[in-house]
């Protein structure tokens, strides 16, 4: 997970 990452 991150700001623009979903996984």
Curated annotation (Swiss-Prot):
UniProt lineage: Eukaryota, Metazoa, Ecdysozoa, Arthropoda, Chelicerata
Protein known as: Venom peptide 6
Tissue-wise expression: Expressed by the venom gland.
Subcellular location: Secreted
UniProt KW keywords: Secreted
Family: Belongs to the non-disulfide-bridged peptide (NDBP) superfamily. Short antimicrobial peptide (group 4) family.
Protein's UniProt keywords contain Secreted: yes
GO CC terms, sorted: extracellular region
């Amino acid at each position: 997970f991150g700001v623009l990452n979903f996984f």
